[in-house]
C-alpha cells in the first residue's frame, strides 16, 4: 500500500476549502503548504520506521505531531499519526487525529427513514442474502477507522458459505509470498495489516480457506493509471485462471464506486467491471458512523440512531428487496451504531460477541511506561501481528513528555478483546524489551475480563480467564476497575 499520493488528493478534496477560508490565503498557497507538509510527514514516518519496536515508532510520530503546530502540517500529518494510533490499539485518538466531515451532498438519496418502503435489517444477515446473485462483493473502509473493518471480518464466514473463495485486500503486499501457507500476517504482509483488526480480517480469510491476494499497483502509477493497474492485478490473479471465481474485495474509500469520476478517471471497481463483465455488490462503510464530533456526522446519522437505537450495523432494504445506498455508485450503505467505550476501548472490538474482554493492568509493566500489551495466538509465530494490543500509560497518549512527571497512577488498566483459545501475552517497553510474558486461555463461555494471576518476566505459566469476580475477591489495585466489569 502506498498511502501518500492518494492522501494528498483526498485532503485537498475534503479539507482544503475549509482551511483556505480560515487562513485567508489562496488555494494555491494552501495547497503548496500541504504538499510541503506531506513531504515532511513522509520523512518523519520513514525516520520513525527505523525504530525496532512499534511503540518506539509511535513515540516518534506523536511527539512530531505535538511539536509542530502549523495547521497544514497538523491536517496532513494527523492522518499519518492516526494510522499508528490504530496500529497500537488507540482507536479513540486515531479517530480524533483525522476525522472526515460527512456533509450532505446534492446527489444524496433521501433518508430511508422518510420512506415507508424501506426497513432496517442487521447487516450481518442482509448482506449475505444480497450477495447471492453476485460474483463479487466489494467492501470499502476508512483506513484509520478500524470500526469499518469489523463487519467485513464477521461476514467472511457467511460469504464463504455462499461460495465466495477469493479475498483480495488492497493493503496486502504481493511480496509476502508465504502468507497463504503461513496462515497469518506479519509486519511484512502489508501496511494497514499492522492494525490488529485488519490483521484479523486477513487471518480469518486464510482460516476459512479463501485464496488471499494483494493487488496494489507495483508501478509508481497514480490516479486513473493506478486504479487500472489494480484492476488488472485482480484479473490476472483471479479471473484469468479461474473464470468461475467468487471474489470478496477490501479497499479504501471510493476505490469501489461503480460510477462517476474518481481521481480524474475511473475507480478500480469500474476498471475491473470492464475486464470481467460482472456486476459486483458494492458495500459502502465509510460515511455513516459516529465521529468524535457530532458536527462531522452525516445529517442523516443522528436522527436514525435516535429513532432505531441499534446495537449492531444496519442496512436498509425495500419491501421489493432493493438495498438503499446514500450515494450513487454504491449498492448498499452500512450504518454503524454509536460506539460504547469500556475501559478506554470501544466494545466493537468484540466483533459482535466473537471476542471477549480480557482485563490487563500496568502492574506487570514494572513502572516502565508507556507499556505495550499484546496477545498473540499460541499457534502462531512471534512475528505474527497480535490478535489485539493496547498501550498502558498513566498519562494520555497525546500528552507531551513533561506530563509524565505529573503522573501518579502507576496502574493504568484496560481490556484486550480475544476469541476463545490460547494466547501468548507479553508486556514490553518502548525499546521492545519484554517486561512480562504469560500463556493465557480464554474460555468459550462467560465474560473473560478477570486478570490472569501474577507472574514474572519470562514466566510461561498458564492463566485461565474467568467471569468477572466480586470486588472483594480481587486485589485492591483492581477494585476500581471491577466497578466497570459488567457495564
Where are these regions (language model features)?
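Compositional signal for N-terminal targeting/processing segments
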Residues: 17-487
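Bacterial N-terminal signal peptides that target proteins for export
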Residues: 1-7
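Bacterial N-terminal signal peptides
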Residues: 8-18
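Intrinsic disorder/low-complexity detector
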Residues: 7-8, 479
Amino acid at each position: 500500500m502506498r498511502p501518500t499520493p492518494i492522501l494528498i488528493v483526498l485532503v485537498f478534496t475534503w479539507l482544503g476549502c475549509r482551511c483556505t477560508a480560515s487562513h485567508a490565503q489562496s488555494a494555491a498557497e494552501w495547497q503548496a503548504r500541504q504538499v510541503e507538509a506531506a513531504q515532511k510527514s513522509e520523512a518523519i514516518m520513514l525516520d520513525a520506521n527505523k525504530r525496532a519496536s512499534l511503540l518506539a515508532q509511535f513515540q516518534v510520530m506523536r511527539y512530531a505531531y505535538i511539536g509542530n503546530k502549523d495547521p497544514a502540517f497538523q491536517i496532513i500529518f494527523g492522518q499519518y499519526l492516526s494510522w499508528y494510533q490504530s496500529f497500537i490499539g488507540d482507536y479513540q485518538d486515531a479517530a480524533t487525529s483525522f476525522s472526515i466531515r460527512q456533509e450532505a451532498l446534492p446527489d444524496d438519496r433521501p433518508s430511508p427513514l422518510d420512506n415507508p418502503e424501506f426497513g432496517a435489517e442487521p447487516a450481518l444477515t442482509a448482506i449475505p442474502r444480497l450477495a447471492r446473485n453476485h460474483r463479487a462483493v466489494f467492501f470499502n473502509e476508512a483506513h484509520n477507522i478500524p470500526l469499518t473493518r469489523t463487519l467485513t471480518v464477521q461476514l467472511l464466514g457467511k460469504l464463504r458459505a455462499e461460495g465466495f473463495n477469493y479475498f483480495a485486500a488492497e493493503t496486502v503486499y504481493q511480496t509476502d509470498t508465504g502468507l497463504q501457507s503461513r496462515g497469518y500476517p506479519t509486519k511484512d504482509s502489508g501496511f494497514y495489516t499492522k492494525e490488529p483488526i485488519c490483521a484479523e480480517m486477513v487471518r480469518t480469510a486464510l482460516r476459512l480457506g479463501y485464496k488471499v491476494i494483494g493487488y496494489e499497483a507495483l508501478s509508481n502509477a497514480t490516479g486513473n493509471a493506478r486504479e487500472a493497474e489494480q484492476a488488472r492485478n485482480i484479473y490476472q490473479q483471479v479471473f484469468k485462471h479461474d473464470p468461475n471465481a467468487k471474489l470478496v474485495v477490501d479497499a479504501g474509500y471510493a476505490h469501489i464506486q461503480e460510477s462517476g469520476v474518481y481521481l480524474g478517471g475511473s475507480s478500480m471497481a469500474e476498471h475491473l467491471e470492464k475486464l470481467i463483465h460482472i456486476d459486483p455488490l458494492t458495500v459502502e462503510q465509510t460515511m455513516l458512523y459516529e465521529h468524535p464530533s457530532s458536527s462531522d456526522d452525516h445529517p442523516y446519522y443522528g436522527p436514525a440512531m435516535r429513532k432505531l437505537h441499534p446495537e449492531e450495523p444496519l442496512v436498509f432494504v425495500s419491501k421489493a428487496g432493493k438495498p438503499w445506498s446514500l450515494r450513487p455508485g454504491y449498492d448498499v450503505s452500512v450504518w454503524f451504531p454509536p460506539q460504547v467505550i469500556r475501559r478506554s476501548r470501544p466494545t466493537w472490538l468484540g466483533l459482535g460477541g466473537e471476542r471477549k474482554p480480557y482485563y490487563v493492568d500496568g502492574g506487570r509493566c514494572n513502572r516502565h511506561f508507556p507499556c505495550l500489551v499484546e496477545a498473540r495466538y499460541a499457534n502462531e509465530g512471534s512475528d505474527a501481528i497480535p490478535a489485539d494490543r493496547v498501550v498502558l500509560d498513566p498519562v494520555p497518549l497525546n500528552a507531551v513528555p513533561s506530563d509524565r512527571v505529573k503522573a501518579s497512577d502507576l496502574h493504568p488498566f484496560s481490556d484486550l478483546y480475544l476469541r476463545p483459545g490460547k494466547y501468548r501475552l507479553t508486556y514490553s517497553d518502548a525499546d521492545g524489551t519484554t517486561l512480562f510474558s504469560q500463556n493465557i486461555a480464554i474460555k468459550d463461555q462467560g465474560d473473560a475480563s478477570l486478570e490472569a494471576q501474577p507472574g514474572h518476566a519470562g514466566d510461561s505459566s498458564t492463566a485461565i480467564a474467568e467471569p468477572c469476580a466480586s470486588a472483594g475477591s480481587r486485589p485492591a489495585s483492581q477494585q476500581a476497575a471491577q466497578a466497570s466489569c459488567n457495564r
